[in-house]
Amino acid sequence: MKKRIVACMLALTMVLGLTACGGSGNGSSKSGATTVSGETEAVEINGITYNKATDLTDEEITLTYFHFDQDETVKYLADRFMELYPNITVNAVYENVATYNDTLLTLVSNNETPDVIMYSDCDFALSNFLLSDVSGFWNSDPETAKLASTINDCGVGCYGTSARFGVPVKFFPGVMYIDMNVLEALNVEAPSRNWTWADMIQLIKDCTVLDSPDGMAYYGCGYYNRLDSYYGIAAAQTIQGEFGFDGTDFDLSVWAVGEQEFSDLKLGGYIAPTTETQEMEDWMGDWEAWCGASGHVALFTEAFWTYQGTWATEAFEQYDLDIVPYVVPAVSEADASADHHSIATIDFGGVTTSCQYPREAYELLKFMSFGVDGWKTRIEVYNDTSITNASGLALKYDVMPAPITTNEEVWNGYIDMYCSDMDEEHKALWEEYFASCLQPIPYGWTSIAGYWNFCDEYFNSIGIHDLVDKGTAKAADYAEEATRKANWYHATAMLKYFGAEGYNVLTEEEIALYEQMVTDNQ
């Protein structure tokens, strides 16, 4: 599913450099607040105690929230927000991710810009100047200091500036899954919970048995996400983004190591066949089969939502799997011995530049994303399995994210809900995993200015992945040129989006730095 979502998002147009205009149709009155006061009053609804902000307008207003989140969940959240703030009407508008960007630009061109939006492709949002700077609210909000550490430490959503344009809405931590039944069948010892990258590679090799006694080959790894994307973050704690990005510069020599290692595993026969290939039909007897249902794969680089949405469902009980989570390993033993940076999927949101009530819009965005009150409400709806999506599936099984707050009450409630059908042993493994995944680094196209332009116009256009995977080229052969290209695209984007002709938030020193990067990397 995620492959289709990402493919659709990345294929969408990134044209029409429109400055967001229009409004919510609420008149010309504006809330004068530029910060969050932090003053609240306790309100109880359905046994949940909320901290209702007291610094919002008391006018009757309407806010439009345009999103591609799970629709029924958002409607539930919107209803609760309106119950808390009865003077605010929330118009929650869902759009399928495949048409989201085009529909949003149409709304902008028709003077119907929503007040709050979601987005994944940061180049799309930034090049169209859709997002306002919410740093005044963010920096004064007590809750933002209690999020996963990298959100503030690495400026996630700031895009290398002192401003803040994006906030994390949906957080899907990076995770490695191991089928313990496969390890038992092969008499392979489970790796340490503080495993290293080398430990993982060894496990993949140890669990690949092509001539197995039962006549069906065992593979060490079934992949959904490529290992090179993981390696680019796992290599060092100084890395803040894919392709060895340190916050300013790229270094694709880091990526090249992981890319080559993954290619060597594929060429060496350690990676399970993928769906809709002749290799899959030969192995599982079904062109449409998925290696995650084989019972013959040790490790999976699947998405976070695959466990609840697939493996935890009744339909998969027949496959005799024992799937447990592991944190994405770090390369060095020192990093692996403690909590460390790991790749994550994060969808972002922001307040648009035309919003007439930015303080209230920020509170709505917070409720829909990282806020403690919003997460208390999410846990309530996820616990109620009678509330379903259009297909009749309980909402906890429909691409449910994880909290990005570190609030203990939220996490206790989330783990109890997430692990409600597990025994104590498996619950303990999930508790340990969740405690170790709160240094997320988002995929580059969601978090680094110019990243997708680089991928679209250079990296993907010459097909580097395919060339290396087929053994016709070495990743290291591209590292130097790709580094120059990535730095040029990034510096160009920083000047375009944030320089004098854009948001105008760069200092003279920063402008000089990026101008020099453009010159040096022509």
Give, region by region, the residue ranges found by the protein language model.
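Short, well-ordered beta-strand elements
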Residues: 58-69, 88-93, 116, 165
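Extracytoplasmic "Venus flytrap"/periplasmic binding protein-like
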Residues: 80-149, 184-187, 288-299, 315-318
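Extracytoplasmic/periplasmic substrate-recognition and gating elements
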Residues: 83, 89-91, 186, 314-402
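Glycine-centered hinge/linker elements that transmit conformational signals in sensory
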Residues: 204, 245-282, 323, 327-333
